[in-house]
């Protein structure tokens, strides 16, 4: 399970694969295995240990892995210069936040994971589509290559900032709502309060490397950067996916009610 979702210490393959694979494959790998992995984990753990006499405190073990995963992912992301590797470590850190919800046993824990994964799909794919656009149009694969891009692609730069803000969990974005509901599980269940502190600290750490991209786009200059003709498919994909970060912030309650009802009807717990 840990290998599939890129949980520390089974994350070692993720940065190299993300950097070496075509970016379309990387975008797929950043989302699909996590959705499948958490679906299997929920079914396995909640079925195997529900009412079991086995003396295994698996929620505490998951909580420890959660703290390790988000911390290692964020710290290693700080020193990355390649955009795909940075997003790879960012992806690992987000697994840590989802594991946080998984460690709090209950129906709303499952709802929170589904809620987070749904929002993560849009915020992460929009960031990867922007990386794909930059690589194709400007051969820009490192953060320094993005210097001054806001002056050449102002619309896409704005939506990239929106995606990064959502990945960081800043309001008013869907990523903020997703993290609030993840942390809400801890405060309601009154379990692993230390893990909430770790999550908040890691959120602050992530701001640094997300802002490094924003800084390059808006506050650095590259006189040799030439404006390119945009790829219409990527252009509209970035706008559509990224705009959901605001749309779902405004209308998140209906989605939450639907997912909560769906989990209740599934009868896993």
For each feature predicted by the language model, list its residue ranges.
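Alpha-helical transmembrane segments of multi-pass membrane proteins predominantly involved
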Residues: 1-269
